[in-house]
From Swiss-Prot:
Stretches for region Beta-1: 19-112
UniProt cross-references to PANTHER family, sorted A to Z: HLA CLASS II HISTOCOMPATIBILITY ANTIGEN, DM BETA CHAIN, MHC CLASS II-RELATED
UniProt topology in membrane: Single-pass type I membrane protein
One protein family per Pfam: C1-set
Domain Ig-like C1-type: residue ranges: 114-208
Effect caused by changing S45F: In allele DMB*01:06
Cytoplasmic side: 240-263
Result for mutant: Y248A: Abolishes targeting to endosomes and results in relocalization to the cell membrane
Motif YXXZ motif: where in chain: 248-251
Start and end residues of each stretch annotated as Beta-2: 113-207
Entry protein name: HLA class II histocompatibility antigen, DM beta chain
Signal peptide: 1-18
Source organism per UniProt: Homo sapiens
Length: 263
């Protein structure tokens, strides 16, 4: 980067107006699943404008900016192409990618992380079934995962048989989900089965429809009866407290100060 700093510094000093100036150098390595480098890039930007990039076919830096900074991009490209040390390093870009990535490639790609699984009801779509389940699977690595559904232990087809690709979370883990449309019946058990290399055994998550209609009716009647009983009991206690206690009250001005004994 030192080789082209004078050019970028000159451009910065020649610009007017408020704000800062940023020179950005980006180098990337594209590797396949085995860790073999497939592509190498090296680009230079100024204030987010891409100026020049390494052209592997021409073995030189080529301008990428064709707007107001085109002249700068050409001058910068010509200047960098005269730097033999830089040119040699860029020609060996793919080889350097392999050298720099292999020491930690295994620790990053050979690791595994088991998935977290949860089954929940969701809004049905593209189906006449009244209920739809979603099996959420997240936080796993690598991306390959198998999701199947079972009803009372027997395999059933998901809502869509199309293969779904796991989506990256941005933290070296992935997420995906599977749907199942159904008409629930009392006593049925639906199970989402997730198989992944990070889990020693398949992960099972069950879902049941809940109470039967008769049970729901009985529970509702019992709840209403209990509520009415509590209301009646509360009203009785309030009425009793307001009425006070009935007892004998002697009249004032008794004519028999010593009392009267009747035998």
């Amino acid at each position: 980067m030192i080789t082209f700093l004078p050019l970028l510094l000159g451009l910065s000093l020649g610009c007017t107006g408020a704000g800062g100036f940023v020179a950005h150098v980006e180098s990337t390595c594209l590797l396949d699943d085995a860790g073999t480098p497939k592509d190498f890039t090296y680009c230079i930007s100024f204030n987010k404008d891409l100026l020049t990039c390494w052209d592997p076919e021409e073995n030189k830096m080529a301008p990428c900016e064709f707007g107001v900074l085109n002249s700068l991009a050409n001058v910068l490209s010509q200047h960098l192409n005269q730097k033999d040390t830089l040119m040699q390093r860029l020609r060996n870009g793919l080889q350097n990618c392999a050298t720099h990535t292999q020491p930690f490639w295994g620790s990053l790609t050979n690791r595994t992380r088991p998935p977290s699984v949860q089954v929940a009801k969701t809004t049905p779509f593209n189906t006449r079934e009244p209920v739809m389940l979603a099996c959420y699977v997240w936080g796993f690595y690598p991306a390959e995962v198998t999701i199947t559904w079972r009803k009372n232990g027997k395999l059933v087809m998901p809502h869509s048989s199309a293969h779904k690709t796991a989506q990256p979370n941005g933290d070296w883990t992935y997420q995906t989900l599977s749907h199942l449309a159904l008409t629930p019946s009392y006593g049925d058990t639906y199970t989402c089965v997730v198989e992944h290399t990070g889990a020693p055994e398949p992960i099972l998550r069950d879902w049941t429809p809940g109470l039967s209609p008769m049970q729901t009716l009985k529970v509702s009647v019992s709840a209403v009866t209990l509520g009415l009983g509590l209301i009646i009991f509360s009203l009785g206690v309030i009425s009793w407290r307001r009425a006070g206690h009935s007892s004998y009250t002697p009249l004032p001005g008794s004519n028999y100060s010593e009392g009267w004994h009747i035998s």
